[in-house]
UniProtKB/Swiss-Prot annotation:
Any single GO CC term annotated in Swiss-Prot or TrEMBL for this entry: cytoplasm
Subcellular locations according to the entry: Cytoplasm
EC number: 5.4.3.8
UniProt-listed Gene3D superfamilies: Aspartate Aminotransferase, domain 1, Type I PLP-dependent aspartate aminotransferase-like (Major domain)
PANTHER family assigned: GLUTAMATE-1-SEMIALDEHYDE 2,1-AMINOMUTASE, GLUTAMATE-1-SEMIALDEHYDE 2,1-AMINOMUTASE 1, CHLOROPLASTIC-RELATED
InterPro entries attached to this UniProt entry: 4pyrrol_synth_GluAld_NH2Trfase (IPR004639), Aminotrans_3 (IPR005814), Aminotrans_3_PPA_site (IPR049704), PyrdxlP-dep_Trfase (IPR015424), PyrdxlP-dep_Trfase_major (IPR015421), PyrdxlP-dep_Trfase_small (IPR015422)
Pfam family, one: Aminotran_3
Catalytic reaction equation(s): (S)-4-amino-5-oxopentanoate = 5-aminolevulinate
Chief site of localization: cytoplasm
Name the record gives this protein: Glutamate-1-semialdehyde 2,1-aminomutase
UniProt record similarity statement: Belongs to the class-III pyridoxal-phosphate-dependent aminotransferase family. HemL subfamily.
Single GO term (MF): glutamate-1-semialdehyde 2,1-aminomutase activity
């Protein structure tokens, strides 16, 4: 193929090629939810992404969460370039992994020790194996609509793109594995009590704030009750903070709610936009990973220098606090304006720099509620915003994110476009 020709193809032409090369035309299913075909992005800067055609979009997807500083922040880019000059993979430890681990441990209260991996999926997979190895129990309790990555142990009643494409329980997972996963609804402590009572649950695994069924918040007493129940029945508590870690608070949702798990999984923001995952927790638990213990985990790219330096540089910016002030203000303003503009039945779940709007329903407290929202209206809302060059997630079951690059001028421009779209839909 003529590489020069490829650079001038438009999105429709690229989509035609992609469908010949990839299952469904994409390499992660939610990307195909943009209709009639995905637009292809060439670059990003600040709050904006730019397509191969040169169209400029205000971006509220932000790579599905990692880009809390916006696209290509200079402070992070500079350090990545410096590291690229030195090398990007050595097959040995580097001092960068120590620096990033210290950063994480200084902010995440429960992170006494850490194992770096390459994605949120790898992190939850390793965390489940670790919990089983440590507890000598085989079952896991998860919550409907929580999404913990694309592996067998959690693709049961899963949210995110699994819900979008109606494969909440994936084909290809042996029944024997499914039988090791118990399910409760989010915010349902009675169910948790019943499931844990048999004392065969290694760990309860959840997103402390659901970010993969829209945004769904824990009700008062839910996380504290869950912590008490897991302790009472000698089960571990795993917080999947791949989305919420370093976004809700520099210490994650656990710091925000003051509820501390035994194990935390991290990803997204701690890699500054590069592939990363981490399993963090109490030293006595994490020390069960090889080579200290007998729970095997390994990876060629674990703690690769580029992800490490990008994470360090990102957290250094977050320590200055201004990113949270800007991102949270942007989110709050957008939610307030949406509430003012929307005249139809709806609810907006919002915390920090993440929110989602649900149409046709006045309360969403769990996955069952989220599925009752008017998905078709949300799709129209998304499509009309695309025409105005505003990019929100194409799926109802994802999160709208803001960043430190969403300054007042960006937000005000967005509000004008929201007013136009909502007026057209009314």
């Amino acid at each position: 193929m003529d590489k020069g020709r490829c650079t001038i193809l438009n999105s429709e032409e690229l989509w035609a090629q992609a469908r010949q090369l990839f299952a469904g035309g994409v390499n992660s299913p939610v990307r195909a939810a943009v209709k009639p075909f995905p637009f292809y992005v060439e670059r990003g800067k600040g709050a904006y992404i730019y397509t191969v055609e040169g169209n400029k979009f205000i971006d509220y997807v932000l790579g599905y969460g990692p880009l809390i500083l916006g696209h290509s922040p200079e402070s992070v880019k500079r350090k990545i370039i410096e590291q690229l000059e030195k090398g990007w993979l050595f097959g040995t430890p580097s001092k960068l992994e120590i620096e990033l681990a210290k950063k994480i441990s200084s902010h995440i209260p429960s992170a006494q020790k850490i194992r770096f991996v390459n994605s949120g999926t790898e992190a939850t997979m390793a965390a489940i194996r670790l919990a089983r190895g440590y507890s000598k129990r085989s079952k896991i309790l998860k919550f409907s609509g929580n999404y913990h990555g694309a592996h067998d142990y959690t693709l049961v009643e899963a949210g995110s793109a699994a819900t979008e494409y109606n494969v909440t329980t994936s084909d290809g997972i042996p029944m024997e594995i499914m039988k090791t996963v118990e399910i409760c609804e989010f915010n349902d402590l009675d169910c948790v009590d019943k499931k844990l009572r048999n004392e065969d649950i290694a760990a309860a695994l959840l997103e402390p704030i659901m970010g993969n069924a829209g945004v769904i918040l824990p009700e008062k007493g839910f996380l504290s009750g869950l912590r008490e129940l897991t302790k009472s029945y000698n089960s571990l508590l795993i917080f999947d903070e791949v989305i919420t870690g370093f976004r809700i608070d520099i210490g994650g949702a656990q710091s925000y709610y003051q509820i501390y798990p035994d194990i935390t999984t991290l990803g997204k923001i701690i890699g500054g936009g590069f592939p990363i995952g981490a399993v963090a927790g109490k030293a006595e638990i994490i020390d069960n990973f090889t080579p200290a213990g007998r729970v095997f985990n390994a990876g060629t790219f674990n703690a690769n220098p580029i992800s490490m330096i990008a994470g360090i540089a990102t957290i250094e910016e977050l320590e200055k606090e201004y990113p949270y002030n800007i991102a949270n203000k942007a989110s709050k303003t957008l939610v307030e304006e949406l509430e003012r503009l929307l005249k139809i039945k709806h609810t907006i779940n919002h915390i920090g720099s993440m929110f989602q709007v649900f149409f046709g329903i006045d309360k969403v407290r769990n996955y069952s509620d989220a599925k009752r929202a008017n998905k078709e209206y949300y799709i129209k809302f998304h499509e009309r915003l695309l025409k105005e060059r505003v990019f929100i997630p194409p799926s109802q079951y994802e999160t709208i994110f803001t960043s430190a690059a969403h300054e007042d001028d960006v937000v005000n421009d967005t509000i004008d476009k929201l007013a136009k779209v909502i007026g057209e839909l009314s």
